[in-house]
Amino acid sequence: MCSRVWFITDRRISQEYPQIQILRALKERCVEDDVEFRYLLMDEIVLTITDGQLGLRVGQEIVTSYPQVAVVRVPTPWVQSDSDITVLRHLEKMGCRLVNRPQAILNCVNKFWTFQELAGHGVPLPDTYSYGGHDNFRKMIDEAEPLGYPVVVKNARGHRGKAVFLARDKHHLSDLCHLIRHEAPYLFQEYVKESHGRDVRVVLVGGRVIGSMLRCSTDGRMQSNCSLGGVGMMCPLSEQGKQLAVQVCNILGMDVCGIDLLQKNDGSFVVCEANANVGFIAFDQACGMDVAGIVADFVLSLLPSRLSRKMSLLSVVSSTSETSSEPEVCIPTEVIIPSEVCIPNEICPLGTTCPIPDAMSTMSTSSTSSESEADLTETGPTPVGANPAYNINSLLASEMKLLTE
């Protein structure tokens, strides 16, 4: 049976960095492994049910060869269950393994839905309130008082750090009520003061942490999104942080995701957000990684032919280990931190001094802490902080030391 992989994305984000890089990597891997590949935009697909059987058309073409695995990149804040999710459900019902699955995407479309899924699993979360009804923001001004002030206010479908506010007091909340748009509900969330202006973005592929990046605001604002002028730096993550990110990923059922963590003074973490359509332009640059290539390798590993091969290899290894008397030897691989992502003129976590005079000044902006890293056209030079004495290199060094203690 011929192996087939599809890449499906939304026309609105098809020309952005993550989609372009995943398309490149998938094409390369499929050519190397003799896998049939097809690239489609969501609005090109026509769903059919004929003679009681599910089918697909692309334009006037009746599709007869379906993929075993399909990578999906949709702008999660704008996902519509009556259109986008319907297409993905159709493919899933036809036996296609989706990365990510429809339910995993839905779990991250709305920030409160994400917390609903995580609640009850022992995941540390900031106390959060929301509301039903179309426009009950004003009523929540009184209802959310137990959270204290200042309080974080977020649009449930916000993205890229937008529609996020820090309300100083009740009067400030009343002012916000007149300014915000009410298409989606808002969250009222406990303010984690210790993590103001910084968070840790953890990227996972196939349920495994592939890297982590410390993000810091450069202008004193609460959000640390690189798309808003924040800067990112590769940083090692404690075992507790890794385990928490993996736990969140598994609960939400995601294959590829970004988990944003806030850190308290005692070194513990709380979950800020989860991103099913994680962007990785700044992550690639900060960590010296090719996330798209890692995603492509994972996707091809899901093909039935690969899974069968893995089972055969496991069988051989198992029988060999039972008959062999030789002890297994694990050879540790050398950990290399690229010099271009080290902290300039400071001490790296591994104890070496970085020679680069100002690596952080070359960092590009990344997308969002929230769902999708849409609209890379907004990326630009990092704004200069309001305080001229603000030293981002010193801040990053101290934060990385805190994270690894």
Curated annotation (Swiss-Prot):
Residues 115-300 form the ATP-grasp domain. One of its GO terms (biological process) is protein modification process. Transmembrane segments: none annotated. Its main location: cytoplasm. SUPFAM superfamilies: Glutathione synthetase ATP-binding domain-like (SSF56059). It is an enzyme of class 6 (ligase). Mg(2+) 1 binds at D260, E273. Pfam families: RimK. One of its GO terms (cellular component) is cytoplasm. Its EC number is 6.3.1.17, 6.3.2.41. Keywords: ATP-binding, Cytoplasm, Ligase, Magnesium, Manganese, Metal-binding, Nucleotide-binding. Its cofactor is Mg(2+); Mn(2+). It is found in: Cytoplasm. Mg(2+) 2 binds at E273, N275. Residues 360-371 have a biased composition (Low complexity). Binds 2 magnesium or manganese ions per subunit. InterPro entries: ATP-grasp, ATP-grasp_RimK-type, ATP_grasp_subdomain_1, Rp_bS6_RimK/Lys_biosynth_LsyX. ATP binds at K154, Q189, E190, Y191, V192, K193, E194, S195, H196, G197, R198, D199, R215. PANTHER family: BETA-CITRYLGLUTAMATE SYNTHASE B-RELATED (PTHR21621:SF0), RIBOSOMAL PROTEIN S6 MODIFICATION PROTEIN (PTHR21621). Catalyzes the synthesis of beta-citryl-L-glutamate and N-acetyl-L-aspartyl-L-glutamate. Beta-citryl-L-glutamate is synthesized more efficiently than N-acetyl-L-aspartyl-L-glutamate. N-acetyl-L-aspartyl-L-glutamate (NAAG) is the most abundant dipeptide present in vertebrate central nervous system (CNS). Beta-citryl-L-glutamate, a structural analog of NAAG, is present in testis and immature brain. This is Beta-citrylglutamate synthase B. It comes from Danio rerio. The lineage of its organism: Eukaryota, Metazoa, Chordata, Craniata, Vertebrata. The gene is rimklb.
